[in-house]
Swiss-Prot record:
Job of this protein: Participates in the electron transfer process during N,N-dimethylglycine (DMG) degradation to sarcosine.
Protein name: Electron transfer flavoprotein subunit alpha
Cofactor note: Binds 1 FAD per dimer.
Example GO BP: fatty acid beta-oxidation using acyl-CoA dehydrogenase
Gene field: etfA
């Protein structure tokens, strides 16, 4: 009998159709479980209302709108599982899958974590020939949980030659990695933050034909590489399928981030020094940009105001001093205090900021949905029981005007001290 895996098209169709009466049954049979949320075709997160919440002690279902309770198991169970992830150590890998994350701001972005999840799939596909994920990180970084993101080996390159915008020097460093370990796959984010350009330069140097705009990778026994990838083409209007090449540039949400295992992230050292390259590019530093001109969907630091703000001049002054992009709740927009394009939430703009400060925002459900992807949320509010306080990673209870004035004073003093020291 053939050992090739057999696929049931009907079961796959039911698994994709969340309204089918046998949807959860088929998911359980396929080992996927029932999903509580998933990204929709336009990028918005969809939630299954039957999988949100938890059963209270009196048997009544409770729904926590702050986002701390997810799925049917509740937040405590999730936290317990996260604290006891099994540690996976691969002493002698059969091959390497190299990942070059963007590391914007010195930390892994959501795009980087998706890419590491894809690398983990490629490395763990064959238990008999286990691979390892090698992360090549340029410059200083602040990450302390690279192992939880799925990294088995870490190569940290931090030298003046590759600091800043230095694509030629960085490609030379990647060529050295290629000569030292010859990874089976090279994965880079297809982004405007450096990964897209670096991946194309690397492919040209190695003479490889890369795949760009990848959003899906599936196992394929008939493919020469064992994998089939689907990429965006024709300005995003066409899907192109081809065998997965050695160099792949993937989009965000190309795979699920690693969440169930921990890895060692053992540090490696290049066997030879980095080659000296004559760069034809001179990095003159970053160009200062007015935060007010940055679109909310692209902003990394947002200071949002709601109905609790009484002194709008103080709010605008704080946003200017902090260098934050201004946002607003629906109430503030409806009252005419902020323009419509500054509205945050499911009825406005979905934001993915690294830091989101909510000033005087109680936290309507549509607003909480819009800030769900934000990494750190800080709430300034007079009501300690509002939903935004429950959602926030850091909460400050008090008058927003006084708190913003004190914050502006501290930032101004710190800048003056730094200027005097220089």
């Amino acid at each position: 009998m053939s050992q090739l895996p057999r696929r049931d098209p009907r079961q796959e169709w039911i698994a994709r159709n969340r309204l089918h009466p046998r949807h959860e049954e088929v998911l359980a049979a396929l080992g996927q479980g029932a999903t509580s949320e998933w990204p929709g075709p336009n990028g918005l997160m969809r939630k299954n209302p039957h999988r949100v919440g938890f059963i209270g002690p009196n048997g009544i279902k409770r729904i926590d709108r702050s986002g701390t309770q997810q799925g049917a198991g509740g937040g405590k169970a999730s936290a317990s599982v996260a604290g006891h992830k099994p540690l996976t150590e691969i002493a002698e890998p059969a091959f390497l899958v190299a990942v070059v994350p963007d590391m914007t701001g010195g930390r892994l972005s959501g795009h980087d974590k998706d890419l590491l999840g894809l690398a983990r799939r490629l490395a763990d596909a064959d238990p008999a020939a286990q691979g390892a994920v090698l992360a090549v990180v340029f410059g200083s970084h602040k990450e302390t949980n690279l192992g939880e993101a799925g990294v088995d080996r870490l190569l940290h390159l931090d030298s003046p030659e590759i600091a800043g915008y230095a694509p030629e020097a960085r490609v030379g460093a990647l060529i050295t990695v290629e000569q030292a370990w010859t990874p089976r796959h090279w994965l880079l984010p297809d982004s405007k933050l450096g990964g897209g350009e670096l991946g194309r330069r690397l492919a040209a140097r190695l003479g490889e034909r890369p795949a760009t705009g990848i959003w899906q990778v599936e196992a394929d026994a008939e493919s020469a590489t064992g994998w089939q990838c689907t990429a965006r083409g024709a300005a995003g209007s066409l899907d192109i399928r081809r065998p997965l090449p050695r160099i792949a540039l993937a989009l965000a949400e190309c795979a699920e981030p690693v969440s169930e295992t921990r890895h060692t992230a053992a540090e490696l050292v290049l066997p030879q020094p980095l080659p000296s390259t004559l760069s034809r590019i001179q990095d003159l530093g970053q160009v200062s940009v007015d935060p007010a001109s940055v679109a909310l969907s692209e902003a990394e630091f947002i200071l949002a105001a709601g109905n609790g703000v009484r002194d709008w001049d103080a709010y605008h002054r704080a946003a200017s001093v902090l260098g934050a992009t201004e946002g607003a709740s629906r109430v503030a927009v409806d009252e005419g205090y902020m323009p419509r394009d500054r509205q945050v939430g499911a009825t406005g703009t979905w934001v993915t900021a690294r830091v989101y400060i909510a000033v005087g925002i109680s936290g309507a459900i549509q607003h909480l949905q819009g800030i769900q992807p934000c990494e750190k949320v800080i709430a300034i509010n007079m009501d300690p029981s509002c939903d935004m306080i429950k959602r926030a990673d850091l909460a400050v209870i008090g008058d927003s005007t006084q708190i913003l004035e004190a914050l502006v004073t501290l930032v101004s003093q710190a800048r003056e001290e730094k200027r005097d020291a220089a």
